[in-house]
Amino acid sequence: MRFKGEFFNAIDAKGRASIPAKFRETLSSVYGDERLIVTQSDGGLAAYPYQEWHKMLERVEALPSNDLKEAINLAIISPAVECSFDKQGRIQLPKAQRCYAGLESEIREIVVVGAIDKIMIWNRTKHIERREQAEAFLRAQSQELKNLGF
């Protein structure tokens, strides 16, 4: 079982985000570890299970030293933080990450999305816009979708 589903929620005044119980159960049962590594990703936040994060680091380390590797290190790896759950199933999102993802305004609505091997945390408005763009793209790819069985 991997991460799937979409959950609408909010960040509290202290910057804590509740992660759905279904996702916490997957962390325990599939990964045996509830720690998450949270980093910036394409205007939102990506929360990786500890093991998935380390697999990704190994792939990055294997890259030759070049502009791509440097960009990955600066934009994705450097801002990453380890997060653990409190007793209410929340993680503390650092202010810099909340600002990056547009989660620092008076409206603190978020969407927590399962994305197979990671959990994405989006500003609700941004998530809806991205999903509409994805749906339009998929309509243009109808034959490819049929080939995949969708």
Curated annotation (Swiss-Prot):
UniProt entry keywords in alphabetical sequence: Cytoplasm, DNA-binding, Repeat, Transcription, Transcription regulation
Annotated ranges, domain SpoVT-AbrB: 6-52, 80-126
Annotated GO MF terms: DNA-binding transcription factor activity; transcription cis-regulatory region binding
Main localization category: cytoplasm
One Gene Ontology term, aspect cellular component: cytoplasm
One Pfam short name: MraZ
Annotated protein name in UniProt: Transcriptional regulator MraZ
Source domain of life: Bacteria
Quaternary assembly: Forms oligomers.
PANTHER family: TRANSCRIPTIONAL REGULATOR MRAZ
PROSITE patterns: SPOVT_ABRB
Family affiliation: Belongs to the MraZ family.
Subcellular location: Cytoplasm, Nucleoid
GO BP field: negative regulation of DNA-templated transcription initiation
Gene name of the record: mraZ
